Amino acid sequence: MKFAEPAASKNGAYLFCYFLGNRPNEERICFAVSKDGYNFTPLNDNRPVIEQKLGTRCCRDPFILRGNDCFYIVATDMKSDDGWESNHGIVTFKSDDLIHWYDECAVDFHSFDSTADADKIWAPQAMYDEKTKKYMVYFSCHNKNSEKPLAIWYTYTADFKTFSKPSELFSSKSGLDVIDADIVKKDGKYHMYYKDECVKTIAHSISDSLCGEYREYENNVVSCTERHVEGNCMYNITGTDTYVMIMDLYVDGGYYMQQTEDMMNFLPVDKKDFSLDFHPRHGSMLHITDDEYYKLIKNFSK
């Protein structure tokens, strides 16, 4: 098998935000950092960095982003011990320095007519929309009284506290379930990578606009492995044309890594060339400055 050559990161560092597992004490937000984008070290001895106080007090699939004047985390508000159809909300946090998190908000999507009977609100992510000057939050959604499959829905917010009425963003032409969407903008195009729940692979669709329409194409599976994967996360190696995708090997355990330069054709990264060996589950990546990197290490090494 041909493997990709790791790219040389030019500046800054990387913050990986993730959770650990299906036990209540593992459904917590953890951090890891890297200087090269391939080899990661957990912070705080791989223990939670945020104490969730609202909602179920358990969260999964955390997504971290740099806002216009602060940082945000959005996550699935869910205690899996309550069942996989028990979740109908998300939880959000805000920070000025990546260390101290506040303004926690639990958002119940049963408060909206369009998701009043939702039994799955999973893996929220967000991207700033220059057209609306708001953040588009997108997530996997299923309404229990609907014959429609799991699909990707979206809502808009300015403050991660109040949200617009959710609507469907993308569903597969196959009519089968899709989850775990991750949208990456490059060269004016929006690339959505998502899990096909039928075959347990990562597929790809493209749009000219953040809020769609996302177009599927033939042979759009991009994951390089036949093992079951989900929780895909894509990020750029700074100063290069290389984009890395990491995926949760949720059946076998561990993580799978692959990379691309054209957003469509990937090569796997050899296991010897990356390190994510602290049992992370579905997470997200944030580019950080050297100053932010060293402050995180200093704070969580106490």
Segment roles from a protein language model:
Residues 1-302:
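Carbohydrate-active catalytic/glycan-binding domains of CAZyme proteins
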